[in-house]
Each structure stands twice: as C-alpha cells, then as structure tokens.
Curated annotation (Swiss-Prot):
Acts as a sulfur carrier required for molybdopterin biosynthesis. Component of the molybdopterin synthase complex that catalyzes the conversion of precursor Z into molybdopterin by mediating the incorporation of 2 sulfur atoms into precursor Z to generate a dithiolene group. In the complex, serves as sulfur donor by being thiocarboxylated (-COSH) at its C-terminus by MOCS3. After interaction with Mocs2B, the sulfur is then transferred to precursor Z to form molybdopterin. Belongs to the MoaD family. MOCS2A subfamily. CDD domains: Ubl_MoaD (cd00754). This is Molybdopterin synthase sulfur carrier subunit.
C-alpha cells in the first residue's frame, strides 16, 4: 500500500447504490494523511462491502472528483470523501 504520514479522520459520504451496500449514508474513517487513490478505494471496498460496484465508483475529495486513481490524495482532519456510483435515470 502506498500511504504516508499521520492518520487523520475523514467523513465518508455514500450515495445511491454505495449507500445501500454500505448500509449507511455516512461514516467516519481513519486514513493516512497521504494515500494513493487506488489504495484508498481498495480499503473502502473491503470495509464497506462495495466489491460488486468497485469498477464503477467515483471518488470525490472535498467536492472535487478524483480523476486518476494513481494520484496521491492529501487529507486533513475532517475532510470529506464522497463515494459515488454511476447514477442511472431517464
């Protein structure tokens, strides 16, 4: 895993199918202050049973989409992370 620095507490928000699978609309999670997005996604998938939608999830850090899962994310205490599956509709 590629993670550095101290551990911080972030607020994770779940939307649509991810909310259903996680069985909660939000959670507080301890994460390294620096972590590669793909490693973070793997941790969330395992902890919240999101494997069935992993390949379709979008992450957003403080309302900014994480577009490249190889990017390192820098977290501060109390930051927000959204877990967003593709939205369907018509």
């Amino acid at each position: 895993m590629s993670a550095d620095g101290p551990v911080v507490n972030v607020h994770v928000l779940f939307f649509a199918k991810s909310r259903e699978l996680a069985q909660t609309p939000r959670s507080k999670v301890d994460v390294p202050s620096q972590i590669v997005a793909s490693d973070l996604l793997d941790q969330l998938v395992t902890r919240f049973d999101l494997a069935s939608i992993k390949d379709n999830l979008i992450l957003a850090h403080n309302e900014s989409y994480i577009e490249n899962l190889s990017d390192k994310i820098l977290f501060r205490e109390g930051d927000e992370l959204a877990v967003i599956p593709p939205l369907s509709g018509g």
